[in-house]
A protein has these predicted regions:
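ATP/NTP phosphate-donor binding region
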Residues: 1-57, 71, 178
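Glycine-rich beta-strand-to-loop/alpha-helix junction loops that act as flexible
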Residues: 6, 60-62, 86
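Catalytic core of DAGKc-family lipid kinases
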Residues: 27, 34, 75-188
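Short Gly/Thr/Asp-enriched flexible loops that form oxyanion-binding sites at enzyme active sites
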Residues: 64-77
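Short gly/pro/ser/thr-enriched loop/turn and capping motifs at secondary-structure boundaries
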Residues: 66, 88-92, 222
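Glycine-rich phosphate/pyrophosphate-binding beta-alpha loops
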Residues: 132, 187-201, 274
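Gly/Ser/Thr-rich active-site loops/lids in small-molecule metabolic enzymes
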Residues: 148-153, 202-225
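ATP/nucleoside-binding phosphotransfer catalytic cores, i.e., glycine-rich phosphate-binding loops
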Residues: 174, 205, 217-295
């Protein structure tokens, strides 16, 4: 089953869907095209998948669509998921090595291998890629409210928010160890990137049973872009918990679970989708949560 988000990305979908139909028919594969729901209710889709024994669901959309579909269908044990990335960021797809070009991604779905992939819960929510608290979440909220989509609009909102950004107060608790921090943002990552191959958690793996946590701490704002660039380039190594966590501009560590107290109610996003924030976030990995078709 192909599940198409009709509003994801910036291009028209009709030509792409027609090409997908032709390519799939040429492989003599039975298929059906359906569309995602704005309400998030997939009961009818799920009943059809189970009753008619669909083996694969191919998501044509971005990270938010992937989150919604996987969360609804992940309890069907035999089901495999594919992604044709058509969103603004496509972080999970690119982290998994799925090609950017839609028809190349389709050929991977035909010929690739389904591999177990982790996800995580954050309070009562599901995340399969990356969630964040603070600056990046503010960008996600403003991007969602924008009239236009795409990388240009996302970059524009990032620049606007950079000049207004102020650090937020957090308490971070990991396995009995805790520390307070003033930070511009905290990223909780299963994939290695925000999207568009911007790698915020270079050591992240989709199936290692660990969350990668990146804490961008308070620093002079002129230093902030350079510090983040060092993180993106992989120059910041994973670290152990130490008594004084203020020694580094950016903290980077791994853990299967974490508790974050959001003392100033910084904004929050899940897989790039703006969410209502909370004063506390309990985060836990879900090992081998679903099967994703990859190279």
């Amino acid at each position: 089953m192909y599940l198409v988000n009709p509003i994801s990305g910036t291009g028209k979908k009709e030509l792409l869907v027609n090409n997908i139909k032709k390519q799939t028919a040429a492989r003599d594969i039975a298929y059906e095209v359906a569309y995602t729901t704005a309400s998030g209710n997939y009961t009818l889709h799920k009943e059809k998948i189970v009753e008619e024994h669909f083996t694969d669901v191919v998501i044509i959309g971005g990270d938010g669509t992937v989150n919604q579909v996987v969360n609804n269908f992940r309890d069907i044990p035999y089901l495999q998921f594919g992604i044709i990335p058509l969103g603004s960021g496509n972080g999970l797809a690119y982290a998994a090595g799925i090609p950017k070009k839609p028809l190349q991604a389709l050929h991977l779905i035909f010929d690739g291998t389904a591999k177990y992939t982790d996800a995580f819960t954050i309070n009562n929510y599901f995340s399969c890629m990356l969630s964040g608290i603070g600056f990046d979440a503010k960008v996600a909220h403003d991007f969602a409210a924008s009239a236009s989509r795409g990388l240009f609009t996302y970059t524009q909102q990032s620049l606007i928010n950079f000049f207004k950004a102020q650090p937020y107060q957090f308490e971070v608790i990991i396995d009995g160890f805790s520390f307070f921090t003033d930070a511009y943002f905290i990223s909780i990552a299963n994939s290695n990137q925000f999207g568009n191959n911007v790698t915020i958690a270079p050591q992240a793996s989709l199936n290692d049973g660990l969350l990668d946590i990146v804490v961008v701490q308070k620093m002079h704002k002129a230093r902030l872009p350079f510090a983040v660039l060092q993180q993106i380039r992989g120059n910041n190594k994973l670290q152990q918990m130490v008594e004084d966590m203020s020694q580094k501009n950016i903290l980077y560590f791994q853990t299967p679970c974490i508790l974050i107290r959001n003392l100033k109610h910084a904004p929050f996003h899940i897989d790039g989708e703006p969410m209502e924030t909370s004063g506390e976030f309990k985060v836990s990995i879900i090992k081998d949560c679903f099967k994703l078709i990859q190279p």
